Amino acid sequence: MDARYEEKTFESYFNNELDRKTSIYFPLGQVQEGVLGLDSVARSNSRRLWKTLGYPFWFFQKFSGVELTTIAREMEQHLGREVKNIPAMKVNLLLQYKRPQYITNSTGAEWHLWNQKYFRYELYAQQHALLSHIETTFGNDAVVLYAAPSVVDVDDLVTLKIANSIIDNTNFRRARELDGHHRNTYIKAGTYSQACSEPEKIENFNLIEMIEAMQPHQSVDNAQLIINFSSQINTAMENVEGIGYLKTAFENRMNESRHYELQQFELFYSMLTMSVFREVTGCQWLIPLDGQKNA
């Protein structure tokens, strides 16, 4: 059976706890997405439309509007100040959240690996090909993880949230560790996983300890780190083979912004690129910062 809660609920609880336990930058949080851009933009000279929408002065001259390049220029300055005024960035962290199934009887395909109830989630071939490529080829610039809770019911998830224990009850796997497999299975967060097709035992690790052990980039400043990473992501989306619909969706969305020649605003365009990447892949982009927090 599927775990009885929404994946977005787990993601929200997880991110909130991660922010409390370590120093982290959420480049595409809800607040910044609200500043970065709009969900959709339309322009119309139709007086009838403005009247229908209830604008009280529809009989005056049409709105002059604001050019998108003007907004982009302002946002370039805003984002530049923001990333300059935070601690040094360490690495780009991509998290793919998974809501598992909970297998409760011996007819489960992987039961013989555990001989008890266990959790399982599927790997989607095109998505995994992309994530594995990113982690394998980006070197020290990126860490790519699957994150899946060892919780069945939403009330248990809420209990863990209150206890500040969501992360301790999450199973983590690096993307490249699951190459050649189509599923990952586990019984609880702090133990090993067994990946399938051909069973392979994979040891778990402590996410917070891994983040705290990372060292900040010395060669580039925060803005350049973001610009470089988004450029790598853009290249990967263009060149990785076997990602089908992900490539098509990404290109279609990016072509909308290229039409307005937004590439001249490097930091703004980088954030836009990563926003589209998240929209298409569902992958959360986080950046650990230099400095520690007490859990």
Residue positions per predicted region:
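Acidic-basic catalytic patches of nuclease active cores, encompassing PD-(D/E)XK
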Residues: 1-36, 41-53
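Acidic, metal/cofactor-coordinating or nucleic-acid-engaging core segments within structured domains
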Residues: 18-23, 85-93, 100-246, 251
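Active-site ExK catalytic segment of metal-dependent nucleases
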Residues: 41-43, 50-67, 80-113
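Enriched - but not universal
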Residues: 61, 114-117, 272, 288
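Charge-dense, extended regions
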Residues: 248-295
